[in-house]
Amino acid sequence: GRQRQMCIRDRWGTSLIDKFKSDMERNPEKWEYLGDRSESRDKQYMAAGGISHRYFFNSDASLKTTVAATYSQLDGGASMFNHALESTPYMDLESRHTNLILTSTFNRKFSNRFTNKTGFTYTAMFYDMNLAIPLYSSAASDVYKRQAPYEAQLLETVSKGDGNTSLISAYNSSSVGLSDRWTLNAGIYGQYLTLNNKWSVEPRAGLKWQATPKATFALAYGIYSRMEKMDVYFVKTKSTGNQSVNKNLNFTKAQHIMLSFGYKISDRMNLKIEPYVQFLHDVPVMADSSYSVLNRSDFYVEDALVNKGRGRNIGIDITLERFLEKGLYYMISGSLFDSRYRGGDGVWYNTKFNRNYVINGLIGKEWMLGRNKQNILSINLKLTLQGGDRYSPIDMEA
């Protein structure tokens, strides 16, 4: 007879508002740093929501489709004060982004040893953004530059965009059981950005070996790429006027190689060890400068960039986890790593994320309370030990 078909629907949504204000020191005699005589304000609004639909053709085939929307808004500004407490603006930022997302995935189980997943994602991106900062220009340079202390300098627009574009991606991946102990996962992923007609094709594969009932080994390799934040594509420089100098930037690309060892110590405890290496190329950098988008920390980018940067991450992750039993659980994880990048000047630097080590400990205890043991009292503790932030020493002689 006919197999029963089933549909599952799911809805979700979330939002947040974040506001920040920093006031200046009103007594000029107490000014020691540039920040003492500046004021700033930032307001961020974010919202996301969607609906998912899963249709089961039969027990071996299903189609999941999701429609979602996201919205983000950032309004920021900052002013600098002189000793007469007269203010001069040195940043004005307005940014609004709306994404409409359609994604669909078809899963098919051909046999106990062969499954396939095929899907696509279409993202329509609507943007309206404007960044203005005080600039001066040098006759010997094609690039606008900011110059402290920003007083008596008019705001100039360095990034402005209003329109829409699309990011389209598709993939196909399969899982094949080569034997009772060996499993191969392989696939291909591709994406296309209509803003500048840039595209990428990325193969990915992984091999898993069940060495013993308690021990597994795995090796994975893949190529991954990403577009930049939208404001990067709409930076302008002195000689180009209103023309965007970064609009033809290519994707940043990375090759990932990872080994994995997993060991089941007991029914409630697992150990996992994962060494990895990541090589990045086509990273946007500023020519003849140490600047790279890998180190981006500001709300904005103000320079012309080229895809000539590189990056390298190497490290090992170790995790020991005890699942909840008799009300007790804990997890200890540690990472040792080195993260570096090569700027537009050809020199290798530490990234701002290169803390070299991070150790996390999490432990929790639960008690069942009440007449029918339906209430839960829990105590949880998390500890983190990590390396410090990277910084550039001040050149006192300069």
Annotate each PLM feature.
Residues 1-8, 133-144:
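Short, small-residue-biased leader/transition segments that mark boundaries at the very start
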Residues 9-56, 60-63, 69-97:
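Flexible loop and strand-edge segments within Gram-negative outer membrane beta-barrel domains
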Residues 9-15, 65-71, 118-124, 186-190, ...:
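Transmembrane beta-barrel strands of outer-membrane/channel proteins
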Residues 18, 22-26, 62-91, 162-194, 214-257, ...:
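Surface-exposed extracellular loop regions of Gram-negative outer-membrane beta-barrel proteins
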Residues 56-62, 109-115, 181, 214, ...:
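Short loop/turn motifs that connect adjacent beta-strands in outer-membrane beta-barrel proteins
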Residues 95, 99-103, 159-163, 246, ...:
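Outer membrane beta-barrel strand-and-loop segments of large Gram-negative receptors
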Residues 277-279, 300-391:
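Gram-negative outer-membrane beta-barrel transporters
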